């Protein structure tokens, strides 16, 4: 078994029309054993920016803390809010610094640019190779199932309500086909004037 799949979990982010969505499951386990059903994998790190991390639980918490430290240092030095693109570049550089002893995580960044309100999504591998497409990004143990669902349901210029429906159906149907993730999901819809958080109740097995 890959160390990335040891604790299970999944994250998916999608672009819409002037909005972006990010969703995650709730499971934290050790291989097939479920330890808790409320482990947080998506973190609110800016007014319109979220970071999702899947992989090894200890590395998720370590990387979250170290990236928050670097982000706060940047904002103190520059005296301005950090945008999703520079944050992704900083995270890519941080992960590549540790390429010979990497953190076993797959990060996903989703947010809106503070000036242009342009939606931005990005994911990386464990040594920080970035991928910023125009549609969706996935990470975690049910990535293959998520790719299939997202490719089927996603289309350009989805409104916030439509985007919620698409991302919710995608993640629920994907982790229902994966024993290492699931136990409910949380979806965040980021718009220029508000952030909506919704919790999905699903099969608890």
UniProtKB/Swiss-Prot annotation:
Source species: Drosophila melanogaster (Fruit fly)
Main function: Non-catalytic component of the proteasome, a multicatalytic proteinase complex which is characterized by its ability to cleave peptides with Arg, Phe, Tyr, Leu, and Glu adjacent to the leaving group at neutral or slightly basic pH. The proteasome has an ATP-dependent proteolytic activity.
Subcellular locations according to the entry: Cytoplasm; Nucleus
A Gene Ontology BP annotation from the UniProt entry: proteasome-mediated ubiquitin-dependent protein catabolic process
Complex formation: The 26S proteasome consists of a 20S proteasome core and two 19S regulatory subunits. The 20S proteasome core is composed of 28 subunits that are arranged in four stacked rings, resulting in a barrel-shaped structure. The two end rings are each formed by seven alpha subunits, and the two central rings are each formed by seven beta subunits. The catalytic chamber with the active sites is on the inside of the barrel.
Pfam families: Proteasome
UniProt-recorded name of the protein: Proteasome subunit beta type-3
GO CC aspect terms: cytosol; nucleoplasm; nucleus; proteasome complex; proteasome core complex; proteasome core complex, beta-subunit complex
Top-rank taxon: Eukaryota
Keywords in alphabetical order: Cytoplasm, Nucleus, Proteasome
Family affiliation: Belongs to the peptidase T1B family.
Disulfide bond is among the record's keywords: no
Lineage: Eukaryota, Metazoa, Ecdysozoa, Arthropoda, Hexapoda
């Amino acid at each position: 078994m890959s160390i990335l799949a040891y604790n299970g979990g999944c994250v998916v982010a999608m672009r819409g029309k002037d909005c972006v969505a990010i969703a995650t499951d709730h499971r934290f386990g050790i291989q097939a054993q479920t330890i808790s059903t409320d482990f947080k994998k998506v973190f609110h790190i800016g007014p319109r920016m979220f970071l999702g991390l899947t992989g090894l639980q200890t590395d998720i918490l370590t990387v979250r803390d170290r990236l928050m430290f670097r982000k706060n240092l940047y904002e103190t030095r520059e005296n301005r809010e950090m945008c999703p693109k520079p944050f992704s570049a900083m995270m890519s550089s941080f992960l590549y610094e540790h390429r010979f002893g990497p953190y076993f995580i797959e990060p996903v960044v989703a947010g809106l640019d503070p000036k242009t309100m342009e939606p931005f999504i990005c994911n990386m591998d464990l040594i920080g190779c970035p991928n910023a497409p125009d549609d969706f990004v996935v990470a975690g143990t049910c990535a293959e199932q998520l790719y299939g669902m997202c490719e089927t349901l996603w289309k350009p210029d989805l409104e916030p309500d439509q985007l919620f429906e698409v991302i919710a159906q995608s993640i629920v149907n994907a982790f229902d086909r994966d024993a290492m993730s699931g136990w409910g999901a949380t979806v965040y819809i980021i718009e220029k004037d508000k952030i909506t958080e919704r919790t999905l109740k699903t099969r608890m097995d």
